[in-house]
Amino acid sequence: DAVSRLIYWMGNEYRGVNDFNLNFLKKMNFGLHELHPTAMLIAEDSTSYPGCTKPVDQGGLGFDYKWDLGWMNDTLDYFMKQSGERVSVAERLTFSMFYFYNERHLLPLSHDEVVHGKKTVIDKIFGNYEMKFPQCRALYMYMAVHPGKMLNFMGNEIAMIREWDETKQLDYFLLQYPLHDSFHHYIMDLNKVYLDTPALYEKDYDPEGFKWIAINDMQNNVYGIRRNGKQ
């Protein structure tokens, strides 16, 4: 992906770090923050190279956020399985918190996941047409309560079935169908709850802001999360 190909020679960590490119990234990010303090610089980086989101003056690369591609892959893999098979991959929904605070992670369900035969988010989920919707609502609820900012690509909010095509507009006609219309309203309501609940974002990058309260009932696919705000 984009940033890893700069960090390592041709994106291959076994060929070593590309110091020239690292210096370029540091100078670019530092300069952009100086010129545009409110700009968000986000790295798509699948490697574990340390300090991607650490400030340049502290030895980091200076990005504001980094895509948590591990969270994305694990979460989608979990929801692709039928209910009875999810026990075997139950740790996929908890593993991200073992490394989450190493960087300022962002949770991506991006354009990359709805093109080139990968299927759309809802179409990846196990089950028939009707079965996919409640599971997709659960996926987005999990995303909202998990620490980290959210990136949700256009079309996901209306449960697009057709993959993204940059030459066509989104399939807004889907909103005439009850399941898509209700899903659209669910996403709107979920976003409002998120914005109205400071505990869901105030301490995203502080370990005190998150706690598992139910994690030992994976046989029944039950997870419980507590989020804490500043008050």
Locations of regions flagged by a protein language model:
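Aromatic-rich peripheral "rim/lid" segments of glycoside hydrolase catalytic domains that contact
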Residues: D165-Y177, I187
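Conserved alpha/beta catalytic core and glycan-binding cleft of carbohydrate-active enzymes
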Residues: R5-E166, L195-Y205, G209-K230
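Catalytic cores of secreted or luminal carbohydrate-active enzymes
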Residues: P178-K203
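Substrate-binding cleft of carbohydrate-active enzyme catalytic domains
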Residues: D1
